[in-house]
Amino acid sequence: MSLVYLLIAILVIMAMILLMSKRRALAKYAGYIALVAPVISSIYFLIQIPSVAKLQYLSTSIPWIKTLDINLDLRLDGLSLMFSLIISLIGIAVFFYATQYLSSRKDNLPRFYFYLTLFMFSMIGIVLSDNTILMYIFWELTSVSSFLLISYWYNNGDSQFGAMQSFMITVFGGLALLVGFIMLYIMTGTNNITEILGQADHIKNHGLFIPMIFMFLLGAFTKSAQFPFHIWLPRAMAAPTPVSAYLHSATMVKAGIFLLLRFTPLLGLSNMYVYIVTFVGLITMLFGSITALKQWDLKGILAYSTISQLGMIMAMVGIGGGYAQHQQDAIASIYVFVLFGALFHLMNHAIFKCALFMGVGILDHEAGSRDIRILSGMRQLFPKMNLVMTIAALSMAGVPFLNGFLSKEMFLDALTQTGQLSQFSLISMIAIVFVGVIASVFTFTYALYMVKEVFWTKYDSKVFTKKNIHEPWLFSLPSLILMVLVPVIFFVPNIFGKGIIVLALRAVSGGNHQIDQLAPHVSQWHGFNIPLLLTIIIILLGSVLAIKVDWKKVFTGKIRQISVSKSYEMVYRHFEKFATKRFKRVMQDRLNQYIIMTLGIFMIIIGYGYIRIGLPKVHQLHVSEFGALEIILAIVTVTIGISLIFIRQRLTMVILNGVIGFVVTLFFIAMKAPDLALTQLVVETITTILFIVSFSRLPNVPRSNANKKREIIKISVSLLMALIVVSLIFITQQTDGLSSISDFYLKADKLTGGKNIVNAILGDFRALDTLFEGLVLIITGLGIYTLLNYQDRRGQDERE
């Protein structure tokens, strides 16, 4: 099956979900219909593993805009296969989990699952794209679908603000990424990613190479919540928990990492890129791990832990990026080891973090709270979630016999080996190891502290008063399956390492097939060494800090803390107030004022053009022959136009305005343009009738008395506009001996199959204009339809 067919299948499922929204009896099954999408894609990508392992990459190319080299280029290699499997398999768990989480009585299920399937479609589109512009389109589509999912409970103020904040930051990064893609096109003349990576040596010597890297980093850091662009992720926790489990732990936040991995053969050629990504990742890891301890909301803890873990992966991507410069050197194996660790932890993080979010969702759903100050001794009420969250949290902390331990060991090993790499000095290595270890200590601390406070403290019935708690098996099933994978991967890591991660490494290395020999063999025991010693230190210090320190009291002092999020919110509110004031000053609900402003700006632009280039000399002027009929029609039009200024009755004004339109129809007839005359007649008739019918249903509010100053402004604008239009007509006739474009249209209209030049222009020569005019009418119609069918919906933020 072609990659295009897979995307079409997902779109068909989305259409089915949308249709179900019209039938309330079927709406409750929307989740199970949507579940088909990740199941189909999972089966498809699993089947492709043997082909990709044999280097039989699947690719599809459909021409789209050839002149700009924008095509529907899709390619399935090892890297896209790994990410597609994560998106699809985690998608199955999340979609099924959502069927138990959401209520068919209180939630609009078709709308939710349409948004969720749209997001999955967008993410798969990103990882399969082999064209930069196509990747950008899918990139922004993830931002749009994420906005819709975060604001799903739209009556909730936190949901609205979180959705807007995440949208603004990620779209800003997306626009920066688009600039980077355009720079790549300027440097290479192609938008095809495979071809671009093949010209890496040429690109690195171009003057736009460094600016392009900065644009890429902005796109990646905003999408993957790296400091200081991390602030949108905690706010996004206002979304339903299935959204947090899918978008904000396993998929969307990994898009920035995917981008850097995909372009590592190019970006890694710059040492600056290696430094920036490594240090931003470590700073983000440290900041996220410390800030997680300040949170009382379980989803807040997981949000900052996600930021921290993404920083850890990003740091490894940065260190390993140097492989692009040292593919043939003896130290190449170190870079490959680091990149392998990044991909391995990316997979592990998706599993244990998704399980943690699901556990928190069940606690919130059944206990009605996520506050660790209220939840205590929950192991008695939620034994299954106690098991799930404890194992997943310990895996995140890097405890032995769990998958997170293996990738955390690889991370620590990577830090200690940076001193052997040409990009880092001994001092740099010491700083990197220090920051990485401190961040890991705090990671262990918040992971252990979270499960201790929620499950292993004494149950207090005075604080937690809710009764009749239950823990449904179907609700718990997805998180239990993910929990089982955590120790399984620890005991058989090389099934995933050799079967999936090595295939991804081939793509990250730029197609170097010798990567198979350089890829590490993951072992549970690798002897007493520095990484193991660091792990023991981390576990001991983290345990002491988690057990002995009451972090609820540590961060409740009166010390004023600097918050990036609060700074953003302050700036956002300031600009919002500023914009509101200016908006009220300009938008005063007076249509004629809007028209005057619009025409005034137009006249200023034209006037500036006249000043810059000067008025052209009139050396030829073509005036059509006119007779008595044309003179009479012109006099009638001018007379009615002037009279409209002084008439105060609305109905009379509408009728006279219609008369002007009918006079224009007679002009077209006199000039032998029957098509235009018929069109003008129909439009004018319908418009006049609609105006009359509308006014007959509106209150009879007389037009205000004429204001001399206002009328003078109107007349002045009208006369100036008329003068400009006439002058533009004169200018178009001054050809200076050059051939007119009109001659081409007059001669080529027969080639289009049109009966006359007007039809040919509308249907062929300016077909895109006509198309978009039609789209404007369709959008207007949809807007009117929405207003007519609007019902005030409340209670969308309520959950069972």
Curated annotation (Swiss-Prot):
Family annotation (InterPro entries): CPA3_Na-H_Antiporter_A (IPR050616), MrpA_C/MbhD (IPR025383), MrpA_C/MbhE (IPR046806), ND/Mrp_TM (IPR001750), Proton_antipo_N (IPR001516)
Keyword terms of this UniProt record: Antiport, Cell membrane, Ion transport, Membrane, Transmembrane, Transmembrane helix, Transport
Subcellular location field: Cell membrane
Membrane topology recorded in Swiss-Prot or TrEMBL: Multi-pass membrane protein
MF terms (GO), sorted A to Z: antiporter activity
Main subcellular location of this protein, as a coarse class: membrane
A Pfam family this chain is assigned to: Proton_antipo_N
GO biological process, one term: monoatomic ion transport
GO terms for cellular component: plasma membrane
Top-rank lineage group of the source organism: Bacteria
Sequence intervals crossing the membrane: 1-21, 33-53, 78-98, 118-138, 167-187, 207-227, 241-261, 273-293, 300-320, 331-351, 387-407, 424-444, 472-492, 527-547, 595-615, 627-647, 651-671, 676-696, 712-732, 768-788
Subunit architecture: May form a heterooligomeric complex that consists of seven subunits: mnhA2, mnhB2, mnhC2, mnhD2, mnhE2, mnhF2 and mnhG2.
Protein family according to the UniProt entry: Belongs to the CPA3 antiporters (TC 2.A.63) subunit A family.
NCBIfam families recorded: PRK12646.1
Name of the protein described by the UniProt record: Putative antiporter subunit mnhA2
Lineage: Bacteria, Bacillati, Bacillota, Bacilli, Bacillales
Gene: mnhA2
